[in-house]
Amino acid sequence: MAEIKNYTLNFGPQHPAAHGVLRLILELDGEVIQRADPHIGLLHRATEKLAESKTYIQSLPYMDRLDYVSMMCNEHAYCLAIEKLLGVDVPVRAQYIRVMFSEITRILNHLLWIGAHGLDCGAMNILIYAFREREDLFDMYEAVSGARMHAAYFRPGGVYRDLPDTMPQYRVSKIRNAKALAKMNENRQGSLLDFIEDFCRRFPKNVDDYETLLTDNRIWKQRTVGIGVVTPERALNLGFTGPMLRGSGIAWDLRKTQPYDVYDRVDFDIPVGAGGDCYDRYLVRVEELRQSNRIIQQCAAWLRANPGPVITDNHKVAAPGRVDMKSNMEELIHHFKLFTEGFHVPEGEAYAAVEHPKGEFGIYLVSDGANKPYRLKIRAPGFAHLAAMDEMSRGHMIADAVAVIGTMDIVFGEIDR
């Protein structure tokens, strides 16, 4: 009798659990995965090459569109690399605002991850819970930058503007009566800081709700415990960073090991897993939600007590104020030069990395002294994680491949660049 050979299956790029445009070629023995070959490049937009023909400030909005779930964290790394080459000092208030919004971004990312990962594994309702909180976080983005996602709020030398004193309010519409509207606008009567502090008070209970839905859920544990196990040694050898590395038991976090901005002034813990499976990585990210909430509360308290400038006063790097620009010739010249030519960065090279929600997001910048980068290299955390897809899914069932993709938290904007 003829021997039945393994057969090959295309998974994605249209599959809803492919998290974008992942194409996996799976070699199967029945329903057991023998080999997984990820194909990337379907979302390649040549960001690194485009940056070579744009001034430093013009490339900033491209950063939002790399990992389009963790927008401000991408901007953060880019600005840190430029500041390293320029030798610019960032005002402390701007550093606190950056750290606060980086943590808001971390919560945004992890909420989408927990919703999508749960949905991939059959937990249908967690997505609705997660998106309820994401709405408030997008409102914070909107209040500070005018955009709900691609904020372009960070600047080399600080941030675009200070925190606003008012919050956008829901307006009268045909589908909401006055009573419902008043309840929705209840926590929007004060400043952005008031709104953030109100969110931080409510959020721990919301995280408890997510844990009630998943943590001790028998089906969730069956789908994640013992799936995609990575030992600490293999995690290091594979280049894992972020929750993927901490889930395997290694307490490595750039916010602690190589602190940037004011991370050395805020108090938080690094959650670490023990088993290195999908369930451990889930627990690590859930605890990160709580720790990010702690950091945001500390930043909000400091910002309330310490007014000050939010961008460097070096007008060769940051534009002068509108009032000065319209009344003073020197400021007008600075403004004109910045918006036509941009600033020139001294010759040299710099690498800046941030603890992105997905891992170590790095920007390697080479300058030849011009107003545009000579070379910009992006170190995407998801790239190293996806490379381990074959090792993590081998020997598991085809349904577990979805859980492994989910636990990696991959977004193709940053992997394909």
From Swiss-Prot:
Pfam families: Complex1_49kDa. It is found in: Cell inner membrane. It is a peripheral membrane protein. It is an enzyme of class 7 (translocase). This is NADH-quinone oxidoreductase subunit D. InterPro entries: NADH_Q_OxRdtase_suD, NADH_UbQ_OxRdtase_49kDa_CS, NDH1_su_D/H, NiFe-Hase_large. Its main location: membrane. NDH-1 is composed of 14 different subunits. Subunits NuoB, C, D, E, F, and G constitute the peripheral sector of the complex. SUPFAM superfamilies: HydB/Nqo4-like. Belongs to the complex I 49 kDa subunit family. It catalyses: a quinone + NADH + 5 H(+)(in) = a quinol + NAD(+) + 4 H(+)(out). Keywords: Cell inner membrane, Cell membrane, Membrane, NAD, Quinone, Translocase, Transport, Ubiquinone. NCBIfam families: NuoD, PRK06075.1. It comes from the Bacteria. GO terms for cellular component: plasma membrane. Its EC number is 7.1.1.-. NDH-1 shuttles electrons from NADH, via FMN and iron-sulfur (Fe-S) centers, to quinones in the respiratory chain. The immediate electron acceptor for the enzyme in this species is believed to be ubiquinone. Couples the redox reaction to proton translocation (for every two electrons transferred, four hydrogen ions are translocated across the cytoplasmic membrane), and thus conserves the redox energy in a proton gradient. One of its GO terms (molecular function) is quinone binding.
